[in-house]
C-alpha cells in the first residue's frame, strides 16, 4: 500500500494526475460476490438484474484502473471482467532473488515508479496522456526498459 500511496503522490506532483487509492482486502470475496450475482442474473432473466459490489463501487469512476499486488497478477485479474474499463494489473509473477522488500518490488515491477508508468500508460491508451511522453517518464523514473522480464527468470 505504501508504494501505491507513493505512486499517487508522484502522479499528482509530477504529472498533475489525481489518483484515488482503493484497498482490496480480499480478491477472493470480490470474485465470489461477482460470480454469485452473475449466476443469479443468469437464472432470473426476467427479474431486475443485480450488480456485484465491485461493479456498484466502480460504476461512476471515470479514471483508469491499476492494481498492484504482492501476489501474482492473476489475483487482480480474477475480478477484471467486473471493472467498467480495462484493469492494468501488476503482480509478482516469477521467482524473486532480492534482499529487501524494496528490491523485490523493483524486481517484480510493482513499486511506485512502475505503478506510475502503468497509470500513465493506461491514460495514454485512453488518449488522456501523450504517448510520446512515456519514454520521458521511463527515463525520469529510472526504469530500465530492456531489463529481463521477471516472469522469465
Region annotations inferred by a language model:
Residues 1-153:
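Thiamine diphosphate
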Amino acid at each position: 500500500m505504501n508504494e501505491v500511496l507513493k505512486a499517487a503522490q508522484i502522479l499528482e506532483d509530477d504529472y498533475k494526475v489525481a489518483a484515488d487509492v482503493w484497498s482490496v482486502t480480499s480478491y477472493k470475496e470480490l470474485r465470489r460476490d461477482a460470480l454469485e450475482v452473475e449466476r443469479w442474473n443468469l437464472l432470473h432473466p426476467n427479474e431486475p438484474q443485480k450488480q456485484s459490489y465491485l461493479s456498484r463501487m466502480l460504476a461512476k469512476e471515470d479514471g483508469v484502473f491499476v492494481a498492484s499486488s504482492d501476489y501474482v497478477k492473476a489475483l487482480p485479474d480474477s475480478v477484471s471482467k467486473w471493472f467498467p474499463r480495462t484493469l492494468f494489473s501488476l503482480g509478482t509473477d516469477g521467482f524473486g532473488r532480492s534482499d529487501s522488500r524494496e528490491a523485490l518490488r523493483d524486481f517484480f515491477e510493482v513499486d511506485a515508479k512502475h505503478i506510475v508508468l502503468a497509470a500513465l500508460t493506461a491514460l495514454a491508451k485512453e488518449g488522456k496522456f501523450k504517448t510520446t511522453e512515456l519514454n520521458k517518464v521511463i527515463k525520469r523514473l529510472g526504469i530500465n526498459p530492456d531489463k529481463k522480464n521477471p516472469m522469465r527468470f
